[in-house]
From Swiss-Prot:
Disulfide bonds: none annotated. Belongs to the binding-protein-dependent transport system permease family. HisMQ subfamily. It is a multi-pass membrane protein. It is found in: Cell inner membrane. This is Putative glutamine transport system permease protein GlnP. The chain crosses the membrane at residues 25-45, 57-79, 86-108, 187-207. Part of the binding-protein-dependent transport system for glutamine; probably responsible for the translocation of the substrate across the membrane. Coiled coil: none annotated.
Amino acid sequence: MFEYLIKFSPKILFIVEGTLITLKYSVIAVIFGLVIGVLLALCKVNKNRALRLFADFYTSIFRGTPLLIQLSIIYFASPYLIGIKFTVFMAGAISFSLNSGAYVSEVIRAGINAVDKGQFEAAEALAIPKFLIMKDIILPQAIKNIFPSLTNELINLIKESAIISMFGEMDLMKRAQIVSLETYNYFFPMIVAACCYYILVMLISFIARIIEKKLIVS
């Protein structure tokens, strides 16, 4: 077994290097997904019916269709629809961000609705602008309440990003597939990739628990 690991050590390093690509997609998607999610959530709790309908329609589209189809449309159809040919990385980052935004919006909406409405009414009575009420009072409490759900979204993004390998991106999954074809050994490369995903998820979960404890104390 030890000799086997030494023999395949260059291949193992080749697979592990894909972790950076996987992490890059996930971080970009969770950042932009959070921004999109906040904007959509604000639309969903807005009194303007048109904004609510738009946000609900957006969410239904991205929650109601597979991520693979969304990625395929953005990558293959964008030259015909908008005249722009996205790279695999750009298409992946855009599709993951848009998809994540739909799910995050529902999480944030629930967090906003969970905040005591009396706080909003009290702030309004003090003539505080609605924008500041939402930014300084409601959203900070909502984010604190939904932080575990946001962590789960990041973990899901890390695992779901594996579909980008189908478009030729050299992420963890693609590198494991390449090594499998080169060595005629499918099991070992996939175990290495699985270990990398597992370590990433456990590391993020550990960091998230530390942050969550600090949020609870604050």
